Amino acid sequence: MKSRIAIALSFITILAVPFAYGQSGSASPVMMGRVDIPFKFMVAKKEMPAGKYEVVREEGQGSHLLLRNMQANTSIYVSVIERLAETDPSQKHGARVVFDTVGDQKFLSEFWPADKGDGYLLGINKGEQKHEVVEQK
């Protein structure tokens, strides 16, 4: 009987320790890349200033990426419409973002992590547009 109680207490302790230390099995945020964007742009109906940005994937956020302006200390969650397959995964590149330019406004369209295979489609714009790529050097 005492051995069953000891085994049960050991099992409960093994399950409880991660919660006591705040490690409930969730992974920490993953920084996917940094880019210096030289112009203001629109994302999720919000205008963002030019500056240095980092893109972070946080577990538990589902299909969202966090876009963080490192200078202004502001951030916004961006919905991922779909994943984009890399056409040449062997080619090395820095993190890059793609913008759709419509008239004089630029809209965030895609994000590609540094040296990773797949990208993220973040926005779709209708009508005539021009693509502009900003890549981390």
Spell out what each predicted region is.
Residues 1-9:
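Bacterial N-terminal signal peptides that target proteins for export
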Residues 9-18:
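Bacterial N-terminal signal peptides
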Residues 23-42:
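Short acidic, Pro/Gly- and aromatic-enriched capping/linker segments at domain boundaries
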Residues 42, 68-70, 100:
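A generic structural motif
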Residues 51-55:
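A short tyrosine-centered beta-strand micro-motif
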Residues 57, 62-89:
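Mature extracytoplasmic domains of secretory-pathway proteins
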Residues 81-137:
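Beta-strand-rich cores of mature extracytoplasmic or soluble domains
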